[in-house]
Amino acid sequence: MVCSKGICGMADGSSIEWTDATWNPITGCTKITAGCDNCYAARFAERFRGVAGHPFEQGFDLTLRPARISQPLAWRRPRMIFVNSMSDLFHKEVPRPFINRVFDTMEAADWHIFQVLTKRSPLMRAYLKYRYADRTPPAHLWLGVSVEDCSSKIRIEHLRRSPAAVRFLSVEPIIGPVGPINLGGIHWVIAGGESGPGARPMHIDWARDIRNQCAERGVPFFFKQWGGIRPKSGGRDLDGREWNELPTTMGVHAA
């Protein structure tokens, strides 16, 4: 079952500007940083807590969805697929055998590009070092971490030391200045403001600083949104243009 443009399960098409589709073999999560305070996924899921038969009858409680594991194999046209837009694959309560099954599917469906994003960077790094200890990470698996301000930059270092063909940062929601970023071994940076009720404003200089660092290092930069209660109304221009750059470097391993 899918709902709201596939936010519950898998959807061919996404309102997220930097992907083509979403796939949620896991739903639900727990808040661990200030960047989670106004989580869109939790807000959506909790609306349906207690609604019998709804995919989010249990609200945003962590839930494994084994019936969805093979979904990407049925899509023959290549897509960029955001993995677990409604959860975190590396949540501490997700069993390693289940993570193995998700990776097995991603590796088998090598005509797609899979975008895996986490805030739990130590667990991601440990898993990737285990899985790719004696082989090259597939080029179609992109691994990323979320960063919201300068206090969360340790995740970038964990990512840089993880075996992956493409490593990316999602600096969203930007809730404070990030400061200098070590972009060695990073192939893509997404940035954007917070959206929805209670959204914290993003200062333009925070976004400019990230963009300028990317330009200096030749790292593709994607500006997703200004944010706010109605994020689409603010447009996506930063200094007079949209920034829609995508990764061009693949096959590069731990920095």
Question: Could you describe each region identified by the protein language model?
Answer:
Residues 1-31, 48-51, 161-164, 175, ...:
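Auxiliary Fe-S-binding modules of radical SAM enzymes
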Residues 2-80, 88:
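N-terminal [4Fe-4S]-dependent radical SAM core
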Residues 36, 45, 116-118, 165, ...:
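Intrinsically disordered, low-complexity sequence elements enriched in Ser/Thr/Gly/Pro
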Residues 42-45, 122, 165, 227:
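A very general structural signal that marks isolated residues within well-ordered alpha-helical segments
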Residues 50, 57-60, 104, 127, ...:
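Short, surface-exposed, charged/polar-biased interaction segments
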Residues 55-63, 96-98, 237-238, 243-244, ...:
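Non-transmembrane, interaction-prone segments in cytosolic or luminal domains
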Residues 64-220:
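Conserved AdoMet/S-adenosylmethionine-binding subsite of the radical SAM
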